Amino acid sequence: ETALRGVRFNNTWVPSETYADSRRGTLTGQYPQRQATTRISEVFAGVGYEVREDTQPAGEDVFRLLEQPSPEELDQVEGVIAVCSLLGGNAPMSVLWPGVAENGENNELVSPIDLAPTLAAIAGLDVRPNARLSFDGLNLVPVLRHGASGHAALFFDNGVRMIDAALIDDTATPP
């Protein structure tokens, strides 16, 4: 949680009960059930970005994928920074976008699968529905810039979660 920077999302739900499936969903921007294999880092590499998995100095157009970085490592990185946890249920997530999303909290319903389309949109890639680059996740740029709504619902193997209710493992809340 100390690694969170920028706008903190308080209503963030991981896409799967398992870490491996949540990781796949986050790296692809697709629900894990799709078994997608194209990672967001490959998308950025395909449009000319240098892809790095470290904090070493790099060129101007660089996409960094740092898994489980320390807060000190994140302090070395400049530009847009997205941080999330994939450890069960309501998990911490934040987006730092200098000049746009530098602090505050947001209570919209979101998921780590939203990071891939959000980062792609910030980089100027076309992430509109039916674009060549397709994601299940929601582009959070309108949420960050204009206070737009997040998801109406998130769908999981074991149920569905909405803003004000959930049906998970045959248990409804509120009942």
What are the functions of these language-model segments?
Residues 1-175:
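Formylglycine-dependent sulfatase
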